[in-house]
Swiss-Prot record:
Keyword Lipoprotein: no
Name of the gene: murC
Lineage: Bacteria, Pseudomonadati, Pseudomonadota, Gammaproteobacteria, Vibrionales
Annotated protein name in UniProt: UDP-N-acetylmuramate--L-alanine ligase
Pathway where this protein functions: Cell wall biogenesis; peptidoglycan biosynthesis
Protein keywords: ATP-binding, Cell cycle, Cell division, Cell shape, Cell wall biogenesis/degradation, Cytoplasm, Ligase, Nucleotide-binding, Peptidoglycan synthesis
Family, as annotated: Belongs to the MurCDEF family.
GO MF assignments: ATP binding; UDP-N-acetylmuramate-L-alanine ligase activity
UniProt organism field: Vibrio atlanticus (strain LGP32)
């Protein structure tokens, strides 16, 4: 450990006390974005970090390079020296490491509980909502970094400008994505909370009851202190409905006329969105946002609302918006490729809910009006496909060419009629487009080779392993030479 790092740790310890009697922290499922981010922050705070996952990936390799120990596979001996065990929601209670920790009476906490501990002595800014959390978290982080405030951040995806999804900063500010999928965001006690939107998702957590989901968001906002701030998107009808029930200071944002932070005159020019932000009692801001789509203008205005309330300079806000590189797998422009039939543009996107897919399609249509849109879509979870089946069909039939993969299960058991083949048949039966169903993802490159044309915008879409299609394109030699990004 360098002298500089020792001095930095001493400065951090003056703000954030050590967790007593905790030396070694073990993460089960350390390769996930949320888990790895917390692990990296704690590693940089001086804790010994170990973890396990079913395979190594770039995230775990990064942690190992920084001094963590990562085991491939789960076994009881991995937790033998752990002071505390952190588990992700994807881990089954019968996991041998959980059983061993329980037998040893080692504390077992969920990811959000450990995030709450990181936030406890800091000025926390939490970003919640069904869609847009990761990008909004990155944009808030970018503004605060541009202002020289050096925040700690923990995001659910790669902050491309930082080259990581988490970083330990030297200030008291912690910016974090808040996960509602298992209601664990109720552990967090931030000073500022953003709610981007609320839709029916992860409904198994909420007993299939949308009213329970809405009440959970209200409870989350009431974790704010009486002097805290709730930043809420007034364009979203469910969020608008909840505002009168929130007994904290509320700042609204959106395109709506009654928004406190209002977006006007939005236009998209290729990869960039340009618009004006109108703020009561403050100068208007003419924003150039280096990521496309009206949905990202909303994400940006949420970040601007928080920064404005914190008296961050307009110069820092404008520079952060123009300079943002976005987040990994969120309309991620991977380049242009020679197909043998002309040049095609490749974009990768993580969106896996119908609303997310829809706004991605609209961004592609708005920015590249002359291109044929070829979507490769991989449904994520059988339960989501079942619950939102008609919504998926309505959204997916908007593209010009649709290649459908089977469902990425994420550990779920198959549900009859909620699979890729069934969805393909339903869309075909509507008569608008004729989907191509590919049962084996390894057969995808050859299926794409049969339909791709010069001038296409090829969009790989979904939260599963569809993102590795770009690598397969190279192996198929659809792109012999990757061209310079446009």
């Amino acid at each position: 450990m360098t002298i500089e790092h020792t001095q930095d740790l001493a400065q951090i310890r003056a703000m954030v006390p050590e967790m007593r009697r905790v030396k070694s922290i073990h993460f089960i499922g350390i390769g996930g974005a949320g888990m790895s981010g917390i692990a990296e922050v704690l590693l940089n705070e001086g804790y010994q970090i170990t973890g396990s996952d079913i395979a190594q990936n770039p995230v775990t390799e990064r942690l190992v390079s920084k001094g963590a120990t990562v085991y491939v596979g789960h076994q009881a001996s991995n937790v033998a020296d752990a002071s505390v065990v952190v588990v992700s929601t994807a881990i089954n209670e019968e996991n041998p490491e959980i059983i061993a920790a329980r037998e040893a009476r080692t504390p077992i906490v969920r990811r959000a509980e450990m995030l709450a501990e990181l936030m406890r002595f800091r000025h926390g800014i939490a970003v919640a909502g069904t869609h847009g959390k990761t990008t909004t978290t990155a944009l808030v982080t970018q503004i605060y970094s541009e202002a020289g405030l050096d925040p700690t951040f923990v995001n659910g995806g790669l902050v491309k400008s930082a080259g990581t999804n988490a970083r330990l900063g030297s200030s008291r500010i912690l910016i974090a994505e808040a996960d509602e999928s298992d209601a664990s965001f109720l552990h967090l006690q931030p000073m500022v909370s953003i709610v981007t939107n609320i839709e029916a998702d992860h409904m198994d957590t909420y007993g299939g009851d949308f009213e329970t989901l809405k009440q959970t968001f209200i409870d989350f906002l009431h974790n704010l202190p009486f002097y805290g701030q709730a930043v809420m998107c007034v364009d979203d009808p469910v969020v608008r409905e909840l505002i009168p029930q929130v007994s904290r200071q509320v700042i609204t944002y959106g395109f709506s006329e009654d928004a406190d932070i209002r977006i006007e005159n939005y236009v998209q020019e290729g990869q960039q969105g340009k618009f004006t932000v109108v703020r009561e009692g403050k100068a208007n801001l003419d924003i150039t946002l280096n990521i496309p789509g009206r949905h990202n203008a909303l994400n940006a205005s949420a970040a601007i609302a928080v920064a404005t309330e914190d008296d961050i300079s307009d110069e820092a806000i404008l520079k952060a918006m123009a300079g943002t590189e976005g987040t990994g797998r969120r309309f991620d422009h991977l380049g242009e490729y020679e197909t043998g039939k002309g040049v095609a543009m490749l974009v990768d996107d993580y969106g896996h809910h119908p609303t997310e897919v829809d706004v991605t399609i609209q961004a592609a249509r708005s920015g590249w009006t002359d291109k044929r849109l070829v979507m490769i879509f991989q449904p994520h979870r059988y339960s989501r496909t079942r619950d939102l089946y008609d919504d998926f069909a309505n959204v997916l039939e908007q593209v010009d060419v649709l290649i459908l993969l089977d469902v990425y299960s994420a550990g779920e058991k198959p549900i009859a009629g909620a699979d890729g083949r069934s969805l393909s048949r339903t869309i075909r039966g509507r008569g608008k487009i004729d989907p191509i169903f590919v049962a084996d993802i390894n057969a995808l490159p050859s299926a794409l080779a049969n339909v791709i044309q010069g001038g296409d915008l090829v969009l790989t879409q979904g939260a599963g392993d569809v993102g590795r299609v770009a690598k397969q394109l190279e192996s198929l030699q659809l792109d012999i030479n990757k061209m310079q990004n446009a």
